[in-house]
Structures are given as C-alpha cells and as structure tokens.
Amino acid sequence: SAALGDVKGPMDAASQQAWGAFFWQHRNGLVDPDTRARLQNGGEAQAQWILSQLYSAFSGVSGKELQNDPLMLMRGSQLAMAKNGQRLRLMDGWLVTQDPQGNYWYLLHGELAGSSFDMQQTHQLITTLNTLEKDLKTRYPQAQLLSRGTVFYSDYASQQAKQDISNLGVATLLGVILLIVAVFRSLRPLLLCVISIGIGALAGTVATLLIFGELHLMTLVMSMSVIGISADYTLYYLTERMVHGNDVSPWQSLAKVRNALLLALLTTVAAYLIMMLAPFPGIRQMAIFAAVGLSASCLTVLFWHPWLCRGLPVRPVPAMALMLRWLAAWRRNKKLSLGLPVALALFSLAGMSMLRVDDDISQLQALPQHILAQEKAITALTGQSVDQKWFVVYGDSPQQTLRRLEKFTASLENAKKEGLISNYRTIPLNSLARQEEDLHLLKTAAPTVTKALQNAGLAAVNPDLNAMPVKVDEWLASPASEGWRLLWLTLKNGESGVLVPVEGVKSSALLQEIASDYPGGIAWVDRKSTFDELFALYRYVLTGLLLVALAVIACGAVARLGWRKGLISLVPSVLSLGCGLAVLAMSGQAVNLFSLLALVLVLGIGINYTLFFSNPRGTPLTSLLAITLAMLTTLLALG
C-alpha cells in the first residue's frame, strides 16, 4: 500500500550477516550489564557461566564459537537483548514470540508514509488491510492476525464521526427546517440564519488566522457558540418582522430591536474578550474567534437582513393563547414569579453539592473494544505496552547522554525492586568511557576464564582484547539498532536524548521525584498525566475568567438599570449556569474543561435572552416567541 512508507518483516540473509558482523566486530564494546557483573572480582563468575553454557544441552555452543569468542561476549549481549526486548526473539530471520498455547506469532512492522490522522489515507489503508486479512484467512483458515497502532483508532474515530454526522446531522437539519417552516411558513429565515452564521464563522476564522497564524482545535469546538448565539440575532429580528411586518417597514422593525441586539453583542463580546487575559493560545484564539465572529453575524443582521427579508410572510404568533396565559401568570401569580426561581436555585444548590471534578482525559473517549482487545493481546505476547510513559535522559553530546543513562540505570533498578515499575527498557549501547572500563575488566578476567577452560580439558584459547569502540552514529547506522532507533533523539545543535520506556507504573508522582533527584539531564514524561494536568489548568483558568465575565456583565447591567433591576436581570443567567452544573452532577457526570466551555456558551446565549426580554421597544409576546424559537433551534443544532 502506498500509505505505508516502510514495511519490515523477515530479515534477509544479507541483513542477518551484517547484523551478526556488527556484533562480532564490536563485541568488546557491547558488553551487557549481566556480563559486566560476572566480570567483576577477577572474572570467576564469568568463567563458571561459560562452563555452564558449554555443558548445557540446550545452549548449542559450537567449537567455532568458543575459539572465536572464548569470553562469549556476543552470546551474552544477545541474551541480554532478548531479555531487554522481553518475549521477542529472532528465529529464521523473523522476530517471533510464543503464546502459552505454544503458537508462534511473527511480527510485521509498518511505518506510515504520512500522518496517522490523514483520514482519507488511513481509511484506504485500513480497507486494504482488512481485505488482505480476509484473503489470508481464506487461504489459511487457522491463521490469526492481531493489529495495533494509532492508525486503527484514528480511522475508527473518523468513520464513527462521519456516521454520527450523517445520521444526527440529517435529523438535526430536518428538525430545524420543520421548525422554521412551521413558524414562518417560509424557508427564507433558514437561509438568513445560514448567511449570518456563515459570515460570522468565516470572519472569526480569518481573524484568528491573521492574528495567530493557526487554528486551535479548541477554537473549532467553540465555533459552536457562534452558531448558537448568532442564530439568536437573526431569529429575534425575523420574529419581529413576522409579527409586525404589515404595520412597519423592515427598517422600522430594525430600529425596534437594534439597541437590544447591539447591547447583547457588546455584552457577549466583552465577556469573551476578557478571556484574552488567559496565557493559553487555545483560549485566546477562542476569544478572538467568538468576538469577531459574533460581531460579523450581528452586523450582517443589522445591515443586510432588512434588505433580504422583504416578502417574508406575516402571520399571528403561533400558540398565542398559550404564550399569553404564561405571560399573564408570570405577572400576576407571585407563587410562580418567585417560586420558580427559588425552586431552580434550590435545585442548583442541591445538584452542585454533589458536583465532582475529573480531568482524566481517558474518560473523554470510548475506545473500540475490538481494537482494544487486539492491543492487549499484542501487549501480552510481546511484553511491550503502548503506555506513553518514559524517562528522557538528555545531554549536550551523545556521550554525556549515555553516561547519564548509565548512572540513572541504578535508580531504575531500585524503582523496579520497590515495585514502582514492573520493567524498563534501555538501549543496548555503552558510552565510550564505559567501554574503556569494560575493556579493563575483560583484560583482568581473561586469565581466569582461560585457566578455567584449560582445567576443563579444552584447547587453549586466546581472547582478542583489543579495543572495539562503538560510537553512536555507527550504531544508529547499523542493523544492530533496528527497533531501537526511535528511542534516540538528536537535535541540530548537537544535543541528544534517549527515551527509557517504563511499564507497570504505580505512581507517576514518585517517578517524577526520582527524576527530580538528579541535578539535570533527566525528565519524567507521562503523556496522559501531562494532558490531565493541562486540562485541569485550563479548567481553573476558564473558571476564573467565567466568573470575571459574569462580574463584568453584572457591572454593565447595574450601570444601565440600577442596582435592583440590574441584579434581577442577572438571575436567569446565574440560574442557567447553576442548573446546568446541577443536571451534570445528578446525571453522574463530572465537571471538566469541556463542561466549562459549555457554560461559556450557556452564558452567552442566556445574556441574549435576558436582553431581548428587557427591550423596552419590543413586546413581551414577540420576545417570548423569539426566545422560544431560538432555544429550540439551538437545542436542535447543538443537541
């Protein structure tokens, strides 16, 4: 498939030869930790280990191997790599693992030519792989295939999103069309809504790109606010035209609602612009996008809709009797006008008392079970999980990085003994300084090993004790680094780093403390915890900005209406926020960043409803119809 830039299966004969030759030529420089430990104290332990290999019926030591490598350094390094690589081993050129039932599994590794989030390319690849799997099982019914990789999740997510959009999108569109037609007896209001929303979204996108040069994912999420709020502007004006179109001109209708629209826009934009104070690009982009987008939508209504709404059917208010009874009850029945807000306030307090916060990003996704099951099976077979948790050891040069890694290995062993991690993997490469130390150990231990072999009745051997240095660049360019290269990082300025993946992490905080114990060059990375902390920080900041925005709106209302009426006008907005959080808590959901983003939308829409109802030039009946229609449209569009 063209989607794959590289596919690695069996190692051919030439590659195997090159692989073996590299280890042979550099065996004195690739001494593994177990061999190093056996070489201590004169090398007696190494001598006994060599004899155990010779007399073992399963080791397969040949006379040629003993003559060429009497210290068995190459054998030791290969056994150490097999241990480090967990359950994978080389067999007939393949990386192979075996399950408890005795079945052999062969590893195929592919690298994408492009991004795993290129939806079209990934779907084509997954389709091709599924076809190949069917062909394989047709030819070999007993064959089994397991797959894992980001591409499988991204394709599943994109296809699921397309399905949701096609199903829910069609239902939403039909619902909005039916609602608009039922109320206005025309599709023109729907077209006018689309125009104002589209211009707002376009203006917001252009402004964001001009200022920031890119569009953050959070900005796209918040584009929903432009849909919800800008639709209110259009529907308020069109409702006024539908009810009073025979009595006044389009421009006179605009004059009745202009101040309310501008005040709603000013208040909402001020609330969003306060979020520019946040130090996070995502929230700042969101503020610019919403402020510019809503301004463009409102100005479209003010300057274009009076021209475009000519010929709009004029008809009485739908469900007029019901709305009039509601308005009358609200004015005359104190139990309703006081009791309902009090009841909602009590409901909000009761719900918010059960509120819990959860910034765990894993709770935001529903992983497909069939893909997750395959990933777990591969992890069990290989012993290598895909947890994005690792230490990063870095330095100004490759040798400094390797020296720091060697010192840090002791801490990793202690963490493993204490149960903080179940395992870790380090690249099988020694620093030049460590290679010199190993060569000294070899020279010291060689006489002991030679004597032990002679005492066992074997022919005299003569170990090659010359230096066989391995530099990082040579190792990276050799077949010996296959499967390890991705763990080594090199920057253009010469700085380098190496990843040390760990598994079975019990406490990310304790591992962070281990990294902090070193003066420099060691960093702990837990991608999930990092995102959890980032989302929590965003949530804290957004909560503060939301409260500041509410305070600014309150000050504006008090300055415009006085203390009493100003504070009363805030009651609907505060209750809407409180009830939203209460419903969230009572439904068993936790508060997270996206809950706060939804509250920003609720606040923006709630302010519109309050200002439309308080418009002195509008009639309560028209305002009630406009707000009801805007609410239903928003629920259909966002629900």
What positions do the PLM features span?
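Extracytoplasmic
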Residues: S56-A182, S186, V470-G556
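Pore- and gate-forming transmembrane helices of large, multi-pass membrane proteins
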Residues: V194, N246-A278, R617-G639
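Juxtamembrane segments of multi-pass membrane proteins
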Residues: K335-G457
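Alpha-helical transmembrane helix bundles of large polytopic membrane transport and channel proteins
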Residues: A2-Y106, G419-G483
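Interfacial helix-loop-helix hairpins and adjacent transmembrane helices
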Residues: W251, A255, A296-A350
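Transmembrane alpha-helices and their membrane-interface boundaries in multi-pass membrane transporters
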Residues: L210, L220, V226-M242, R258, ...
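Hydrophobic transmembrane alpha-helices and their membrane-interface caps
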Residues: P189-Y236, K565-T610
